[in-house]
Amino acid sequence: MKILFYRYNSICEPDVIQAFKELGHSVCEIREEMTNKAVTPSECVHLVSNALEKTNSNIVFSINFYPAISEVCNIYHLPYVCWIVDSPVMELYTKSITNPWNRVFLFDNTLYQEFAPLNPDCIYYLPLATNVKAKQQVIKQAKKSGYVMPDVSNPDSIKKLCQYKSDIAFIGSLYTEKNPYDSLRNTSDFFNGYMDGLIEAQLKVYGYYFVQEALTENIIEEFKQCMPDFYTQPQGSYITDRATIAQYYIGNKIAAVERQRMLSLLSEKYDVDLYTGSDTSSLPHIHNRGFAKTLTEMPIIFHEAKINLNMTAKPIRTGIPQRIWDVFGSEGFLISNYQSEIPEYFVPGEDIVLYDSPETLMEQTDYYLHHENERKEIAHNAFEKTLEYHTYEKRVELILSLIQTSP
């Protein structure tokens, strides 16, 4: 099969491309958006149309959903296959989601339940995956040499393996720099009290995101009036103002509050290494290690940490985020917040440790920092299960089998 792959530099792209190739398929890449984030929908249409004329591809593939690509494939009568790996992806709410040549795979079952009725024969549920082989190769090389080269093109970037050891490691944004909620202006006292209470209530609940249901019409109207440049979709979009506020604005705000609180709490008692580009001035006890290279450093960080921490952003309502799969593929030990889909694939206490409150997280952290054998056994269990069932090769095989048998 010939696959035209539209890229924008998602961390998932190289692994999916490798899986396609290892299964014997050829891949032609459109790379313009990897370096030019100002590509317009019309330019996207032009890029894809030109590539289709030249490559004679059987399908077009992308990570996340591009309405422009969907429209092109609808004209060409060619399957447009995309795998949604983030949330929210606002483009899903456009009218293009109903096109009959779409084959959309959603990693979050709640998202699937939301969108499947709009295009029942063309939307699927598919969890994320990881590239176990690549991660183990990086770890094996580092252990053999005792060194890590984050930038393979720069020999001066070399570091000792021991520099990656951590008691507790967290890789990710604090969401403070991508939190549009804080742009609200001139809100009423009632609004402020309502929103503060709603955010605090949601912070106490794991496994169910109720913010969208709790927004009143008056709160929605005041939010729109007090938010400069309120996000609006094109005419005919399926998203409501309620969903936009709950997922795009409040979800990111809750993620920012939760991550800062949890990391502050942990770092006051334990050594916590944070790999991030976010401002950590509000976390004086954190060890800010800067950005981590996805391919060359993250697997080693996950493997060498005594405890890896996952805090799923609230817009991911029930699904398993990419971070969990990548920790497991690196044979790392993980403590994560509870997500309702996790027990469908992994056994709590055997493959993963789940917390449902700050108090539980502190107790689990203290226990597992002092029980190395249990950590290693749990990490190995998750690794073996991931290797057998949750690699990109397995997922890509399933994608291709489903699109070949679909109407």
Cite the ranges covered by each PLM segment.
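Histidine-centered beta-alpha loop that forms part of the nucleotide-sugar donor binding/catalytic region
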Residues: 64, 84-87, 107-109, 127-130, ...
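Catalytic binding pocket for nucleotide-activated donors in carbohydrate/polymer assembly enzymes
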Residues: 4-7, 11-14, 18-23, 28-35, ...
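Glycosyltransferases and closely related glycan-assembly transferases
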Residues: 52-58, 68-80
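Short N-terminal targeting/anchoring amphipathic segment
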Residues: 3-5, 50-65
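Active-site proximal beta-strand in glycosyltransferases
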Residues: 73-88, 103-106, 128, 169
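Nucleotide-sugar donor-binding catalytic core of glycosyltransferases
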Residues: 2-12, 16, 118-122, 127-316, ...
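Short acidic active-site motifs
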Residues: 47, 69, 92-93, 296-297, ...
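N-terminal beta-loop-helix "entrance" segment that forms/cooperates
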Residues: 35-52
